[in-house]
Amino acid sequence: MNEHASPSETLRTALTALLDGLPPKQAAGAVERLIENYRGTTPTHTPVLRDQADATAYAAYRMPATFEAVRAALTALADTAPDWTPAGHTDVGGGTGAATWAVTATWPGSRPVTVLDWADPALALGREIAA
């Protein structure tokens, strides 16, 4: 992550760059399919995020909101326990890593991080965004 920009700004910049590399029709198709999956019956036999286009579309339309929601919750926790800082972070079902960005925004500094998800494209994209 860029040490001179806030995690929120760095995330926004990374997502913009990712979208610049995805053809608009491909992004629109992926977003539409993802919306249908989330509004309908989500298949449980295979990851919803099947490929790079799906992961990018998901990151573009969901990651900022997820980041802000998790950051708000973590900020409340930090305000309640100001002397506590996590020694590490594990995110089960973490996808592209929005919660990890929220942890960094709330408690700056390095710590061990593990993000687990069955959608390899989401994990790969999360690593790319963080690089």
Which residues are covered by each model-predicted region?
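Conserved SAM/SAH-binding beta-strand->alpha-helix loop
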Residues: 119
